[in-house]
């Protein structure tokens, strides 16, 4: 799986900033938040939007702050510590303070499937994450996608796992000039179908190829 884009970090940040509202909108709709692009733009700009719940507005603002962190911090290693920090940004004011950036201690259910994620063990997650991130034979794009899907299926946090997973993966992508992973609205239904299949089987190959083919944004220079 080759890198689709070969940008400098500066170029990749430029692409991300130019399309940031669209990426936030895609993430919000992926989570089932019924928000329009203009509403997302208004929230991003600090405006008032009627018709959305307070939690939905908080979720969108949290995505904004998390993206800003990803784009503005270059010299931070992609590891378990960063993963937990991203969760603090994504889930702020949406979960109990005691759950922010912490491994969940209660069961979670996933809609659309009978799959039950096992309880996360911190030492095991750290070890598994290191193994994924240090695959020298694979490109950074493939490592980013695999880490994202691993985090999604592991469901290590009480809430916000997909958002955390995608932001973590995009930190890898951007730092290495590989573009941006984003699930556009027209691909979300198929993405979810393949995601459920992956949850139940544990085999990520089909979903990984789908994301690589349809869900990486960037520019060719």
Predicted features and spans:
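FIC/Doc superfamily catalytic core
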Residues: 1-221
């Amino acid at each position: 799986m080759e890198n689709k884009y070969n940008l400098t970090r500066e170029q990749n940040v430029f692409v991300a900033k130019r399309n940031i509202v669209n990426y936030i909108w895609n993430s919000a709709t992926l989570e089932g938040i019924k928000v329009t692009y203009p509403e997302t733009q208004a929230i991003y700009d600090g405006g008032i939007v009627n018709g959305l719940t307070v939690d939905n507005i908080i979720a969108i603002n949290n995505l904004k702050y998390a993206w800003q962190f990803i784009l503005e911090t270059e010299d931070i290693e992609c590891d378990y510590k960063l993963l937990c920090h991203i969760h603090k940004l994504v889930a702020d004011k949406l979960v109990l303070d005691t759950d922010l950036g912490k491994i969940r201690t209660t069961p979670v259910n996933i809609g659309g499937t009978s799959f039950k994620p096992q309880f996360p063990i911190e030492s095991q997650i750290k070890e598994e994450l290191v193994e994924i991130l240090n695959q020298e034979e694979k490109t950074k794009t493939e490592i980013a996608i695999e880490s994202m899907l691993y985090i999604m299926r592991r469901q290590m946090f009480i809430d916000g796992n997909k958002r955390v997973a995608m932001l973590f993966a995009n930190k890898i992508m951007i730092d290495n000039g590989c573009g941006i992973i984003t699930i556009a609205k027209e691909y979300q239904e198929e993405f979810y179908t393949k995601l459920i299949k992956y949850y139940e089987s544990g085999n990520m190959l089909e979903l990984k190829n789908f994301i690589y083919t349809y869900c990486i944004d960037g520019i060719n220079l």
